[in-house]
Amino acid sequence: MKIISRVLLAGLLAGIVSSASAQGTAGAARWPTRSVRVIVTFPPGGSTDAVMRIVAQYLGERIGQAVVVDNRPGAAGAIGVNLVAHAPADGYTLLLGPGGAIAINPSLFEHLDYDPVRDLVPVSAVARAPFVVMVANDAAAPASFAELIARARARPGELSYGSGGSGSAMHLTGEQFRHSIGAQIVHVPFKGSVLAWTTMVNGQLSMVWVDTTTMNGALKSGKVRVLAVTSRERSSLVPGVPTVAEAGIPDFEMIGWFGLFAPAGTPADLVARISTDVRHVLALPEVRERVFATGNEAWGSTPEALGAFVRSELAHWARVVRETGARPD
């Protein structure tokens, strides 16, 4: 009787697994039957929002349903991430997760209501861009990144840098720069990168670390110069500008990025279906061109590749926080 019971139990379990698998496959085949919502953790009008709206337009055309951008800013991205983490795992609520909320917050904040690895499933990378260091476009500012380093080392505590906010990726990039060259540089956080660079050109800061979208707007003013870019190799987003590594700080690489995530528990075949559609959109020449115009590089990936990247970013930013002692104000 025990043998028969085991056989019956094994058959029952196999049937359950087979049924669940079939339901998942059928769900992926039917998706979507209604509009899809993508949570963006920034307010309307910024580059992250702009990129998602570009992708949403073309993705909606491909899947035959509207893709609606829902802006949920606040709490360093935690509001939007939490919303998706607790949403039904059915493919109808997705997250455009920025590197800060996904990879930096876990190291900066002791008590987060979410775990990006536990609560989210990677779908596809969407876009990326390096950061840059800018100085005022005047004779008093350093002529090169090497000269900036020399000044910082020669004048402990006299130089200052601005960022778009305490705990931001640009803040941590500035701290890693300070740590790497062994200099004392004062951090001045602002509520937004535009205020940081306009303060700098008025003579109240030595430098600013900003993203390439902010850089593009600042360069149009003619009042700033870009000294270096934080990508491992020179970037087409910042043509002709040397990397930080070229100036003598080896292995210095910091990039901003955002990717598409689904709630944990979303069926793997549905995740694969969404990822395929998103990557198709990001490969379109007109989409790549429009994303580039926002100051970002379109960047699609498989779910597995994004998952591996997120794990590497979590380790990277944890090391930066540990080495620099940076904390949000």
Question: Model regions: which residues?
Answer:
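Bacterial N-terminal signal peptides
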Residues: V7-S19
